[in-house]
Amino acid sequence: MSGAGAIAAASVGCLRTGVPRPFSAYGRGLIIRCHSTGMTLDNINRAAVDQIIRVDHAGEYGANRIYAGQMAVLGRTSVGPVIQKMWDQEKNHLKKFNELMVAFRVRPTVLMPLWNVAGFALGAGTALLGKEGAMACTVAVEESIAHHYNNQIRMLMEEDAEKYEELLQVIKQFRDEELEHHDTGLEHDAELAPAYTLLKRLIQAGCSAAIYLSERF
């Protein structure tokens, strides 16, 4: 059994026995542990947690597809290693949300096939504008995701910061890494992209629509 499979199996085992199992975002792997306190399927706001995990999984999947599109166009250029580094972090984000989907029995959004195509097209399309276009896309998307994560952090803290402590740690860590990507984009001339302000607004409008739809479907 793979490491991810073992983690998922252990998590589901904890859930089936009713033993609370918080999860940790420290290091590169998601560690799901059985404890006497924390989140269980019985004591959480299932609707809220399902929505959070579903939309965040969709967002990280879309981000992976965007970076895949950018690498398809710019992978052999001088900015390729920069994009690859950000993509590697997004792969780790997606891996953790895949594990959470299993642990909390959350179904993915039905719109995954759309985000597959749309994400790659957005990444490749903006990369065709050059390095600046790709970085403008990164700035727009990562700013939207960070704002979205901040909203989730506020909601969970208002509901029960102690109960959701480790979920909050996951989201905060990912939020901080998305902001690093945002800053990387600015450092690599995002604002020099053609029609930068308009491009950013259009991409962020698309992000808002994707978040809205993925939360609900």
Swiss-Prot record:
One of its GO terms (molecular function) is metal ion binding. Keywords: Iron, Membrane, Metal-binding, Mitochondrion, Mitochondrion inner membrane, Monooxygenase, NAD, Oxidoreductase, Repeat, Ubiquinone biosynthesis. The keyword Ribonucleoprotein does not apply. The gene is Coq7. GO terms for cellular component: extrinsic component of mitochondrial inner membrane; mitochondrial inner membrane; nucleus; ubiquinone biosynthesis complex. Fe cation 2 binds at E90, E142, E178, H181. It is a peripheral membrane protein. Its EC number is 1.14.13.253. Catalyzes the hydroxylation of the 5-methoxy-2-methyl-3-(all-trans-polyprenyl)benzoquinone at the C6 position and participates in the biosynthesis of ubiquinone. Catalyzes the reaction through a substrate-mediated reduction pathway, whereby NADH shuttles electrons to 5-methoxy-2-methyl-3-(all-trans-decaprenyl)benzoquinone, which then transfers the electrons to the two Fe(3+) centers. Residues 48-217 are annotated as: 2 X approximate tandem repeats. It catalyses: a 5-methoxy-2-methyl-3-(all-trans-polyprenyl)benzoquinone + NADH + O2 = a 3-demethylubiquinone + NAD(+) + H2O. NADH binds at Y212, R216. GO terms for biological process: cellular response to oxidative stress; determination of adult lifespan; in utero embryonic development; mitochondrial ATP synthesis coupled electron transport; mitochondrion organization; neural tube formation; neurogenesis; regulation of gene expression. Belongs to the COQ7 family. Fe cation 1 binds at E60, E90, H93, E178. This is NADPH-dependent 3-demethoxyubiquinone 3-hydroxylase, mitochondrial. The keyword Repeat applies. It holds the Pfam family COQ7. Sequence repeats lie at residues 48-129, 130-217. Binds 2 iron ions per subunit. Its cofactor is Fe cation. Pathway: Cofactor biosynthesis; ubiquinone biosynthesis.
